[in-house]
Amino acid sequence: MAYSFTERKRIRKSFGTRDSVLEVPYLLQMQKDAYTAFLQADKEPRKRTIEGLQAAFDAAFPIVSHNGFVEMKFIEYNLARPAFDVRECQTRGLTFASAVRAKVQLIIYDRESSTSQSKVVKEVKEQEVYMGEVPLMTDKGSFIINGTERVIVSQLHRSPGVFFEHDKGKTHGSGKLLFSARIIPYRGSWLDFEFDPKDILYFRVDRRRKMPVTILLKAIGLNPESILANFFVNDNFRLMDSGAQMEFVPERLRGEVARFDITDKSGKLIVAKDKRVTARHTRDLEQSGSTHISVPEDFLVGRVVARTIVDADSGEILAKANDELTEALLKKLRSAAVRELQCIYTNELDQGAYISHTLRSDETVDEFAARVAIYRMMRPGEPPTEDAVQALFQRLFYNPDTYDLSRVGRMKFNARIGRDESTGPMVLSNEDILAVVKILVDLRNGNGEVDDIDHLGNRRVRCVGELAENQYRTGLARIEKAVKERLGQAEQEPLMPHDLINSKPISAALKEFFGASQLSQFMDQTNPLAEITHKRRVSALGPGGLTRERAGFEVRDVHVTHYGRVCPIETPEGPNIGLINSLALYARLNEYGFIETPYRRVVGGMVTNDIDYLSAIEEGKYVIAQANAVLDKEGRLTGDLVSAREKGESILCAADRVRYMDVSPAQIVSVAASLVPFLEHDDANRALMGANMSRQAVPVLRPEKPLVGTGIERVAAIDSGTVVTATRGGSVDYVDATRIVVRVNDDETVAGEVGVDIYNLIKYQRSNQNTNIHQRPIVKKGDRLVKGDVIADGASTDLGEIAIGQNMLIAFMPWNGYNFEDSILISERVVSEDRYTSIHIEELVVMARDTKLGAEEITRDIPNLSEQQLNRLDESGIIYVGAEVQPGDTLVGKVTPKGETTLTPEEKLLRAIFGEKASDVKDTSLRVEQGSQGTVIDVQVFTREGIARDKRAQQIIDDELKRFRLDLNDQLRIVEADAFERIEKLLLGRVANGGPHKLLKGAKIDKPYLSSVEKFHWFDIRPAQDEVAAQLELIKDALEQTRHSFDLAFEEKKKKLTQGDELPAGVLKMVKVYLAVKRRLQPGDKMAGRHGNKGVVSKIVPVEDMPYMADGTPADIVLNPLGVPSRMNIGQVLEVHLGWASKGIGQRIGDMLQQQAKAAELRKFLDKVYNARGRTEDLAQLCDEELVAMAAHLRHGMPYATPVFDGASEEEIKDMLKIAYPDEIAQRKGLTATRTQAFLYDGRTGERFERPTTIGYMHYLKLHHLVDDKMHARSTGPYSLVTQQPLGGKAQFGGQRFGEMEVWALEAYGAAYVLQEMLTVKSDDVAGRTKVYESIVKGEHAIEAGMPESFNVLVKEIRSLGLDIELERS
């Protein structure tokens, strides 16, 4: 395999034993595909499929007026180009969206000429109508809503279809299983069927009052006879003068206890009374040729009549279907000469009489009565007219406008009720309802299985596209109502479509969804991993999903079908555990929204490289081997028994039974979990914490690649969009800190396209979490690039790999109690080298509004401020970029008009004379908050249309235009150079007809001539050949065209920048100031490894006091060894060992470079490291120069990849340690024989510690829980309104709560005065607080405690209950 630009600089040595059959797919595929399918922007309108926006429009149109003579038809929709790009939207606080314009026709039919069969068109009006704005997805899979980046999380919800379940015996005291079924449509009423403890079957619509199911069956057109015929088989009886003859059916007799003597037709006794009928008995009966059995009279009593019996002579109904036979009824039947009788066959075991009993409890008589009963249940209190009753019943399940099963629902429904076809109508049919009731009765009879609702075959994912489509449909439905009412007017008045359609409901629905839905979330941008995980998240919460409170254990638990689809590790701790999951690494969605995972096909024990994606439903049919199954050289499964999975259970089976095999061992985990090396050695709880905390790592100043990784780092970094990748191949033409200019390869440019790519890098941009997004170029001028190469690193990436922490030398040993209970002891060297220093950017906003008393003004002229306090503001009153500010410093000067106070005549006179204006305004400037300081790195000024810009705003616009012009000039420079190169090739050696500088006719054009002529005059040369002249003219036109398009682009940019900004109502001007704050590591900051080993920095120790090795190397971090055994995260120990080997090999390479070893020697050593164990690397691809350059990158540590579940073994780590530390080096460092431990020395005393200490390198992270953000102090501040107690929390500048337990502590000490102080003057004794202040000012330190306000509140509350309470003064 060929190495990419960054891989050539640093190849990661992998211990994976299996070659990748399938590359890790693009990690944001799910989000991007879903939204592309929703918009279908790049498809021609005629070729769009019916999904997304197209489906929403098709469902809403055509709209027909109430009288039917006016109709509005939808033709097609178009998406406009967004007015602002992503960066402009972020800066200006706008939504990155595109306007939807729908082409509609308003058709008016002629009333006079039209008949009921055909309508004659009178007039057609066609017009494009604005249909609201649809937010667009950025390249990174997020949305910009009101200037902030948001993510729409996919929702895992119960799939539409039919589900059968039971209550597990919880409802009834006896523990009896009550079965139920539920038909869930995508849109429309839910239909439930359920048994009660008395075995009567009921149905409910939308969880309303329950009714016997036979009412529904009658309502769909079945009569009692056909209901019984559908659910029961019949026993045929022939009535005799006494008793009867029953038709002999062997299956029905077998196993029953005979209630009478059974004889064959000759009268021979076959089964005696009270004996069980066996198979031998039924065989004897069959052999004797008996077709009927004589049964006594009492055998018939209590049987249920299957069909209505009518007297043939009189027409009188003798017995109705479902009547029970009594002796009287039998007598009546005999007297009416009824000989043949059909009764339903039931038994206790597998043919319960449930429907018969239900029918008996149902009082409705016919179809209409049943529908009236349903109407009364749905609309209690409304009079049931015939039309209303029929209309309601039709609307419930049979009307496509109100009921939609969806394609998924129909597919699942048909599969569950045993139909072969997967398509069908989107509404229910009578057969569907009947089939569901039949299956439910079968379940109650003991046949079949209930469904598992947590099976991923019964839960599907709703993606962004689908969620947005549902919102758009909602908006269109509201429009449809309004248009329908107004369509009638279009006949009388000359209205156009845009007069009828008001797009507000659509905009409102979309705005509400993207801005405020539970599934639209503020993007987690702490680091690239957090970003990518957020977009791959799958939530069971949200509208139409579960709620935290109601979700039980089963829903949250890991299910066997999660394998390869949903990560079993990465989920939040706390109330959302198991409800929010992450998609597994290779998972994708199928057309129905079910999660699929890839498997390699196995044919006759031979593993092929063909890949099939299976959903959870399909997977259950096959035997699937694990990814680490042993294969021989030909790729055949070896061994008698292979470890595999069948229906979710682990089994051992023969190789020829295996049909599929896992693609990769990492297939079961998510991106975050797959970045944890040695994950297989960590306890699941700690692995969960490790995966979750990796997402909270703060990007540090200088990212450093992990020495021990898993090989997914590069994929994750590229797919997250944090790094900049080359969109086309080419050579680097120009690089500086802010932009990279690439001259594109000729074969990758399309004719007429500019052959240059300019990448503007992001510099010091604030993320959603206030961390710093900053890109650094990693290419130099002249570098050759291939499409997809990483050309600039972003936050938390190093040479195109995710790097969320720093590699630290860790020693596992206690140190004076400073690492007790997971505390972390850290060396001062780490702080002084800025290893964990991070930059945080805060955005401070000030608005000048138009108030009732006049407009606020942003100005430098502020009352009562000295020149000293204003010296950092420019003449517009805005701070300059680069100023270092402290708490309380003014950032933007602003004054607000004050209300006019009533003045005495003298004051009025003085003011008239001296014009003292300053007291009219008050100072409302933007200042730096307490506890915050930093450097101003950027200022943005926004001005409303029609208000003059100040100098600062104009300067910002000029700078922006200058930058844009620079880009255009670069593009033009390269395009021109390219064009003149082509012209030179075209003209050299050609004969000319004349040209500038007195070129004679017939002269040959050569290089000296061309270099003597100005390039722009080359176009004046007249070649003799016509085709050459034509080509020259073409190049000239293309250049002119390019220049013109660049000028247009510049003008458009200028227009955008100079037009007024959209600001909130009443705001005239807005200034945003960005402060960059440097945060160094300090005690109280939270840190963690990648294995859930978290802790808080307890002390930063001078480097000379840290434990050190025999060669003088001091440890960076000292961790408590007791944090490992009980937590069972042994992965950290293995990481430390392999990290130690990595550093040792790096040092050996560094030594070789320092001694200027020959390239061949270097190659030999690297070949030994890379190709001794694990996956081999082809170093022959690298020339000597590249090899030495790579070695320079390896000198600080050899990067390893130990893939999840396929990582480095103990032997491999030992081998690497042996290569890294030969005996001589090991001795010098004081290492033990295993090379994993060393004898350390106490930095303070120089004494050697008694026992060897485990030491090595671990990738350690600083988390986004910084003590600076949490610590604050309050002396006086805001108080709660009712209780008058200080507020709580940093945001409210609150105090520390002195709670119940703290009061007990003071009581225990008997500190009465301290306690009184705490409960009164330091809390809510208002008068007392003021008096204490006064006494302190006067220098007297006396306390006069009064009544706490909260006590007064308590008294008032007791009085409000009607209990009088009074205080007695003692």
Curated annotation (Swiss-Prot):
The keyword Cell division does not apply. One of its GO terms (cellular component) is DNA-directed RNA polymerase complex. It holds the Pfam family RNA_pol_Rpb2_1. One of its GO terms (biological process) is DNA-templated transcription. InterPro entries: DNA-dir_RNA_pol_bsu_external_1, DNA-dir_RNA_pol_su2, DNA-dir_RNAP_su2_dom, DNA-dir_RNAP_su2_hyb_sf, RNA_pol_bsu_bac, RNA_pol_bsu_CS, RNA_pol_bsu_protrusion, RNA_pol_Rpb2_2. It is an enzyme of class 2 (transferase). GO terms for molecular function: DNA binding; DNA-directed RNA polymerase activity; ribonucleoside binding. Signal peptide: none annotated. Keywords: DNA-directed RNA polymerase, Nucleotidyltransferase, Transcription, Transferase. Its EC number is 2.7.7.6. DNA-dependent RNA polymerase catalyzes the transcription of DNA into RNA using the four ribonucleoside triphosphates as substrates. The RNAP catalytic core consists of 2 alpha, 1 beta, 1 beta' and 1 omega subunit. When a sigma factor is associated with the core the holoenzyme is formed, which can initiate transcription. Belongs to the RNA polymerase beta chain family. This is DNA-directed RNA polymerase subunit beta. The gene is rpoB.
